[in-house]
Amino acid sequence: MLPARLRTFFLPACLVALAVLVASFRLENTVGLMPCPLCLSQRLLLGGYALLCFAAVLQAPGTRGILRYARLALGCSLAGALLAARHVWLQGAEGVNEVCPVPIGRVFEQSWSEAARQLLLGGPDCRSLAWSFLDLTLPEWSLLAFLLLAVLPLSCLLAYRFRTLART
């Protein structure tokens, strides 16, 4: 059985994910930044990450459950980091408008598979550099947040791995 302190990795992870979500909604509502398709996809993954961590805190599973939750949370955070890295690349690349042709308002007028593809590819709104803080744009902050959120489940998995190696 994993010690209780490994289970407590999920509470700070949940709180940090919720803080990032609140910050993104605050930027939308107070500053007026409208989310692009990649931002919406990242919010969805961030919400999934927060729900996974919250479920892990509430359920307080055994060793196998903790490892499953950690793997799922790590998958969510790495997928979010990949989307954020793509967003950063789109903002820095020249001539990628043909890659992301549809604005967010028309994404859901298409089939579900096409809408999912557009949410993952991004839209023309994804290239705008409307906001920055400490010389980092919002997608760069998202990438940093997802990478930091990946550290918590990764440390849980590594702690379990080193603990099992120490027993043998």
Curated annotation (Swiss-Prot):
Molecular function GO terms recorded: electron transfer activity; protein-disulfide reductase activity
Plastid recorded as keyword: no
Pfam entry (one): DsbB
Stored InterPro entries: DiS_bond_form_DsbB/BdbC, Disulphide_bond_form_DsbB, DsbB, DsbB-like_sf
GO cellular component, one term: plasma membrane
Highest rank taxon of the organism: Bacteria
One record GO biological process: protein folding
Primary location group: membrane
Family: Belongs to the DsbB family.
HAMAP family: DsbB
Protein's job: Required for disulfide bond formation in some periplasmic proteins. Acts by oxidizing the DsbA protein.
Protein name from the UniProt record: Disulfide bond formation protein B 2
Organism per entry: Pseudomonas putida (strain ATCC 47054 / DSM 6125 / CFBP 8728 / NCIMB 11950 / KT2440)
